[in-house]
Amino acid sequence: MSDQLVAPPPENCPGTQSEMSGKSAACAGCPNQQICATAPKGPDPDIIEIEERMKTVKNKILVLSGKGGVGKSTFSSQLSFALSMDEKVEVGLLDIDICGPSIPKIMGLEGENIHISGQGWDPVYVQDNLAVMSVGFLLEKEEDAVIWRGPKKNGIIKQFLKDVYWNDLDYLVIDTPPGTSDEHLSIVQYLKTSNLSGAVIVTSPQDVALIDVRKEINFCKKVGVPIIGVVENMSGFVCPKCNKESQIFIPTTGGAEKMSQDMNVPFLGRIPIDPLIARSCDEGKSYLITHPNSEATKQYNLIFNKIKEIVNNSK
């Protein structure tokens, strides 16, 4: 099981094969604790299947946030839409926010179902080169609650990675829930040997959000996930009448750029508030296409180009 760990074992670790694995005092606070406590002893054959399935995916990008409500899923969707605007580029969007799957609605795929073929689970397509998978496609009704403990969440994430037939992808964007929970440990564990490109971390400017983003950055550093960069979302509001910018969420400690400098991680840019972004998400449309000349679209595209450059130059 040692090849499944997401971080080096701590001092006084009882060992991955011990009956006290994940349960001793030395395990408290270790990123591997849940893995050691719940995983069966011995190698996990599913990891080999995941590695084989992921060989056809060139770039795998995690989208993270420390706190909920900062626009992470919106960012994931618009990144996927932007990448797929090149018809020669194949894009997948995987939603592992198990308890709050919003991607089907944002992508205009409400009411769609998963179909199984001889090659595995078929993702749902927005267009020929943009495929989506989410637990939301497994629910009978949109408002159905997903009340699962960690092991069941881990199981569905593993199934998404090893059983979904993505075919050849240039990019797989992975939308995660906020925080550093079971879903994050699982995705890092399962993709550890599959050349994870890195993580984009989304925040809003105020300090209450930045506190949790610092934790997210430390999580990535601890488990060995490369940080592509930090995005400050909801950064100011430009009045459509007078073009004057107002700060809705005041960056009292310098905002995401200052925090990125302090923590020595790349800062990718700022996206202003635009109520039409929320409307596009509610309607399941690409904001970049419906509002190509807006200031937010300009900033989105600058950030997306930086992400592509960083990911492609990291190989």
Curated annotation (Swiss-Prot):
InterPro entries (UniProt xref): Mrp-like_CS, Mrp/NBP35_ATP-bd, NUBP1/Nbp35, P-loop_NTPase, YlxH/NBP35
Cofactor: [4Fe-4S] cluster
GO molecular function: 4 iron, 4 sulfur cluster binding; ATP binding; ATP-dependent FeS chaperone activity; iron-sulfur cluster binding; metal ion binding
Positions bound to [4Fe-4S] cluster 1: 13, 27, 30, 36
Note on how the cofactor is bound: Binds 4 [4Fe-4S] clusters per heterotetramer. Contains two stable clusters in the N-termini of nubp1 and two labile, bridging clusters between subunits of the nubp1-nubp2 heterotetramer.
Entry's Gene Ontology BP terms: iron-sulfur cluster assembly
Quaternary data: Heterotetramer of 2 nubp1 and 2 nubp2 chains.
Name used for this protein in its record: Cytosolic Fe-S cluster assembly factor NUBP1 homolog
Organism: Dictyostelium discoideum (Social amoeba)
